[in-house]
Amino acid sequence: MFDILMYLFENYIHSEMEVVVDHDELTNELTRAGFRHQEIQKALAWLERLADLQQMETKSYLDVAPQQSTRIYTAAEMTRLDSQSRGFLMYLENLGVLDFATREVVIDRVMELETPNFTLDDLKWVVLMVLFNVPGQEAAYDQMEGLLFEEAEGPLH
């Protein structure tokens, strides 16, 4: 499923190509690209849920906790997000790339993925996908894109 999300992001969203709106046409294209129908449906449902989280008009769980509260991860979240990934999320919050709400959306989307070996690089892509879908987060998206694609120049000290 994550491979399909990456394919869609790289070929449609990140490349700024016109997004195919027709669900059946998109499914057919992904099938021709070699993806299985069941995985395609899961990936499209994942994207629909991401869009739903961004467009909620009612109070959500994101509005319940105080903005300055400390995030306590569940056992399942700690299994999926290793200490390096959790530290990276905190780093992004400290930089201002993520705020309380976007961090929670990222965690929600990570937990719904069926990727057995979720890595820090996978997390970075999920963050980028989430930020792309949040209105008003263009600067955070650009900053995250820079973090994802920047090449280290010279030795790190």
UniProtKB/Swiss-Prot annotation:
Which positions carry the signal peptide feature in this UniProt record?
Answer: none
Top-level taxonomic group = Bacteria
Task: Report the SS bond pairs.
Answer: none
Q: Which InterPro entries match?
A: Smg
Family label: Belongs to the Smg family.
Q: What is this protein called?
A: Protein Smg homolog
Native organism is: Idiomarina loihiensis (strain ATCC BAA-735 / DSM 15497 / L2-TR)
Tell me the classification of the organism that encodes this protein: Bacteria, Pseudomonadati, Pseudomonadota, Gammaproteobacteria, Alteromonadales
